[in-house]
């Protein structure tokens, strides 16, 4: 099947983020019937491929990235020379996410009749900072007045078996640094010190693992997760001058940045502290009755005979940028059991079925 050959070619590009290593040029040539726009920002290369099939109808986009994380040591094969073995293809980016890119490339190549417009949005800046990739392409599309109505981001979403998960949203991400101030001194004279560890100890239980909301059927609770805590100089006779704490909240729409800040301020009332807090991504949800959710759900069940769970689990992805521009977006791809791992691999059967899912979606979308 052509999707396997295109996938193998994509895996040969040593496209370690943010370098596409020529992968985007290869894709543009393969899909030469689409109008191509190369969009570069801060050394990041992006590609928009778009084709209008009719003046009426809707605009459906596929999104993905060609960049991969570094391979590291310990592989059984050269991670950029795909190995076909026992029904799997081993390569860096096999699951995350050159399989998804190859699948929608082949699906759109075969479209003859579509009511509306089809676009492909590709970047080499997703695994890194992700600041100058998909976001820049969407800005460009807005300027050209060709923002899509719907989008499918082909990230590896499936858990136990192919077809079991469609992402219909994502939690946001809030990062914070908390500094509890004290006064350094000798442990033998605690009355002359201000020990920030002692002062903060009673407040810690109200932060560590605390749920800021109860969650709902779409989102898990917005939980405070402490990622680092330290104070002192690793000696036993000096009290620390301050206590540093870092935490993250993967927040649902029920809890905002302002809510997190207010809760921390209330918890730290009476302490001498500094709080630095920012939101790196916002939560979003595409409703289950949206056309893109329903159509993709139908195609997944038809091809895989599996009923997918519609969920918002996992970390952030470029899908959040589509949502910021008002695009109804979902995510669907192969299983994710070996993403970013040594000997990353994808099942050939999953790859071929993913192509068939996208092909069926396009054929039955209008």
Swiss-Prot record:
This protein's pathway reads: Amino-acid biosynthesis; L-lysine biosynthesis via DAP pathway; LL-2,6-diaminopimelate from (S)-tetrahydrodipicolinate (succinylase route): step 3/3
Q: What class of enzyme is it?
A: hydrolase
What Pfam families does the record point to? M20_dimer, Peptidase_M20
Q: Where does Zn(2+) 2 bind?
A: 96, 127, 340
Q: Where is the active site?
A: 67, 126
Residues binding Zn(2+) 1 are: 65, 96, 155
Q: Where does the source fall among the domains of life?
A: Bacteria
Question: What task does this protein carry out?
Answer: Catalyzes the hydrolysis of N-succinyl-L,L-diaminopimelic acid (SDAP), forming succinate and LL-2,6-diaminopimelate (DAP), an intermediate involved in the bacterial biosynthesis of lysine and meso-diaminopimelic acid, an essential component of bacterial cell walls.
Q: Which family does it belong to?
A: Belongs to the peptidase M20A family. DapE subfamily.
This one is known as: Succinyl-diaminopimelate desuccinylase
Q: What is the protein's species of origin?
A: Campylobacter lari (strain RM2100 / D67 / ATCC BAA-1060)
């Amino acid at each position: 099947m052509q999707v396997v050959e295109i996938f193998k070619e994509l895996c040969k590009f040593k496209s370690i983020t943010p370098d596409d290593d020529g992968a985007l040029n290869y894709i543009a040539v393969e899909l030469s019937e689409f109008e191509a726009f190369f969009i570069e920002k801060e050394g990041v290369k992006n590609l928009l491929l778009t084709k209008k099939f009719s003046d009426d109808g809707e605009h459906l986009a596929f999104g993905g990235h060609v960049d991969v994380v570094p391979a590291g040591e310990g592989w059984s094969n050269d991670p950029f020379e795909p190995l076909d073995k026992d029904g799997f293809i081993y390569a860096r980016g096999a699951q995350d996410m050159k399989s998804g890119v190859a699948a929608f490339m082949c699906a759109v190549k075969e479209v003859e009749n579509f009511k509306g417009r089809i676009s492909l949005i590709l970047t080499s800046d997703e695994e890194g900072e992700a600041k100058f990739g998909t976001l820049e392409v969407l800005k460009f599309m807005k300027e050209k007045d060709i923002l899509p109505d719907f989008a499918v981001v082909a990230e590896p979403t499936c858990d136990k078996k192919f077809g079991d998960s469609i992402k219909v949203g994502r939690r946001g991400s809030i990062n914070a640094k908390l500094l509890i101030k004290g006064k350094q001194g000798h442990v033998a004279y605690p009355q002359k010190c201000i020990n920030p560890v002692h002062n903060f100890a009673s407040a810690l239980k109200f932060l560590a693992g605390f749920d800021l909301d109860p969650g709902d059927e779409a989102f898990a609770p917005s939980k405070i997760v402490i990622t680092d805590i330290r104070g002192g100089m690793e000696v036993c006779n000096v009290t620390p001058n301050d206590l540093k704490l870092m935490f993250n909240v993967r927040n649902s729409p029920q809890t905002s940045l302002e809510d997190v800040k207010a809760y921390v301020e209330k918890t730290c009332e009476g302490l001498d502290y500094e709080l630095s807090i920012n939101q790196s991504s916002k939560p979003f949800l595409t409703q289950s009755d949206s056309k893109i959710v329903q159509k993709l759900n139908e195609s997944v069940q038809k091809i895989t005979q599996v009923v997918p769970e519609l969920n918002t689990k996992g970390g952030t992805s470029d899908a959040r940028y589509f949502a910021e521009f008002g695009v109804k977006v979902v995510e669907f791809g192969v299983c994710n059991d070996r993403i970013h791992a040594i000997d990353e691999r994808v099942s050939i059967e999953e790859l071929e079925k993913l192509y068939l899912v996208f092909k069926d979606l396009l054929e039955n979308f209008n």
